[in-house]
Curated annotation (Swiss-Prot):
Disulfide pairings: none
The name this protein goes by in its record: Probable cell division protein WhiA
Function description: Involved in cell division and chromosome segregation.
Family indicated by similarity: Belongs to the WhiA family.
Organism in which the protein naturally occurs: Carboxydothermus hydrogenoformans (strain ATCC BAA-161 / DSM 6008 / Z-2901)
Length: 311
């Protein structure tokens, strides 16, 4: 089961206690999943979803708000490998649509839900829960962080965006062909959104995966950094040994000043030690900077010999 489906199944079990919150969430389903038709010269509303647990929730909300329903299950065959659930409301559809603001008194269709249904914080949370259940998607946190809300039209998308801004979310509004969608890629904001709509179990799972992922990434960065440092140190040591061997061949190490001869012999005996480790073997011990200074002198001597200025 995908992480998005797990999250939706968790949310589908939340039935708001307040009737105002039930109506706010139901309004999201009517707008996002609803399809209007005519039956016996009357308006018929059909809500379609492939999610059985969401269909059950919508049925409960409609029943709690006094609407009679009929449910149909349509098998789309082996190619689709899933059923679709149709919840039909055949009575008082015009009253339902007018109540939510989707039809005005003159019978004109509107793309926005009545603002009175989402003026309270508790109702806004239920409304956003419905929006996510009806049109949301969420990547598994083990991959890229991405939460998306697919919406039926731009006017409704802007209304949803306005509600989200009240909670300081920074969803971006884009279009995929002609369909608008809002999306988030920030992990902290995705966690806040899950908390807002009541997906607490999914929030904990998301956070656990995120922590493990970030620790693993941090370890990888440290390993990569350490590997780069080791490669650099090995390259430097090889260059130092080549310079020392060249000096020994051309003029002999006995012709070096004692401090340089000492560090040269120490490097030849310990090709794998760092500058700091070499410094600790000297008497008295020498800092990393001091050791590096001596090797710079040896490098200059080797360069002078190669250029014929010494030897």
């Amino acid at each position: 089961m995908s992480f998005a489906r797990e999250t939706k199944e968790e949310l589908a079990h939340i039935i708001p206690q307040k009737s105002c919150c039930q109506r706010a969430e139901l309004g999201a389903y009517v707008k996002m999943l609803g399809d209007l038709g005519i039956s016996n010269k009357k308006l018929k509303l059909s809500l379609k979803t492939p999610l059985s647990f969401l269909a059950r929730k919508i049925l409960i909300l409609l029943k709690n708000n006094g609407f009679k329903t009929k449910t149909l299950v349509q098998d789309h065959g082996r190619l689709s490998q899933k059923n679709f659930y149709y919840i039909e409301v055949e009575e008082h559809v015009d009253e339902l649509l007018k109540e939510y603001g989707f039809i005005d008194e003159k019978g004109n269709l509107s793309n926005r839900i009545n603002e009175n249904y989402i003026k309270n914080d508790c109702c806004r949370r239920s409304f956003l829960r419905g929006v996510f259940l009806a049109g949301g998607s969420l990547n598994d946190p083990a991959g890229d962080y991405h939460l998306e809300l697919n919406l039926p039209d731009e006017a409704f998308a802007r209304q949803v965006s306005k509600v989200l801004q009240k909670y300081h979310f920074t969803f971006r509004l884009l279009k995929r062909k002609t369909a608008p969608f809002l999306y988030l890629k920030d992990a902290e904001q995705i966690l806040s959104f899950l908390s807002l709509i009541g997906a607490h179990q999914s929030l904990l799972k998301f956070e656990n995966v995120r922590v493990v992922k970030e620790v693993r990434n941090q370890v990888n960065r440290l390993v990569n950094c350490e590997t780069a440092n080791i490669k650099k140190a090995v390259k430097t040591a090889v260059k130092q040994i080549k310079d020392i061997e060249y000096i020994a061949e051309k003029i002999g190490l006995d012709n070096l000043e004692p401090a340089l001869k000492e560090i040269a012999l120490l490097r030849l005996d310990n090709p794998d030690l760092s500058l700091k480790e070499l410094g600790s073997l000297l008497t008295p011990p020498l800092t990393k900077s001091g050791v590096n200074h001596r090797f710079r002198k040896l490098e200059l001597i080797a360069e002078k010999i190669r250029n014929g200025a010494l030897g």
